């Protein structure tokens, strides 16, 4: 059994999950500003890595993203772990406080959660944005008009919904059994959702900084 790279005495990890278009990006920005989280998006790290000069994973990641499939977890976890180490080295938290990492869009499957917690760091909680598919689809199609992202089209969006329900919901359900989920309804205004998010994480002992 390997020892995790980081100790929960030094870092607090919150997994941030929700279907595509549930509003994680917007809420993440608020949490960074008010709670001192470092925001790590698994998707952003993968997208950056696929175009990084000399990347050993670039071609592999491109292929998986194009097919709408989940990238092998060893790759994603390595990128997250390295990003955490880099953040701690370049901008450590204030003395006497723990670094806070908001890991967005990860874990996408149960085995990823287990692998991350065994090798990188056990998580504090899972923040889950629960949003109806029709609301998410409308948001994503609107975003697709300007985002230039290959996967913001109707067919790809529905495929992503299916993948999320089949693979990521079991993660949420598993953490719920351990009483580690802050479950927020995410189909109202950004402000209202954020109020619920704040209330949920503060009830778990994470205060604003």
Per-segment meaning from a language model:
Residues 1-209:
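Glycine-rich phosphate-binding loop of ATP-dependent small-molecule kinases
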């Amino acid at each position: 059994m390997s020892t995790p790279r980081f100790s929960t005495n030094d870092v607090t990890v919150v997994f941030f999950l929700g279907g595509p278009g549930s509003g994680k990006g917007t809420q993440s920005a608020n949490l960074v500003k008010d709670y001192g989280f470092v925001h790590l998006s698994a998707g952003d790290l993968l997208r950056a890595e696929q175009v990084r000069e000399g990347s050993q994973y670039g071609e592999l990641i491109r292929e998986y993203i194009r097919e709408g499939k989940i990238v092998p977890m060893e790759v994603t976890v390595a990128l997250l772990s390295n990003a955490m180490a880099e953040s701690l080295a370049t901008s450590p938290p204030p003395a006497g406080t723990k670094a806070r990492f908001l890991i967005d869009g990860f874990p996408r499957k149960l085995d990823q959660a287990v692998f991350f917690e065994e090798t990188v760091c056990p998580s504090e909680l899972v923040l889950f944005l629960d949003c109806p598919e029709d609301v998410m689809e409308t948001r994503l199609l609107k975003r697709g008009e300007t985002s230039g992202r290959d996967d913001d089209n109707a067919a790809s969006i529905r495929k992503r919904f299916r993948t999320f329900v089949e693979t990521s919901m079991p993660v949420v359900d598993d953490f719920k059994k351990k009483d580690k989920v802050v479950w927020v309804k995410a189909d109202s205004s950004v402000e209202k959702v954020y109020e619920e998010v704040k209330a949920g994480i503060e009830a778990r002992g994470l205060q604003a900084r």
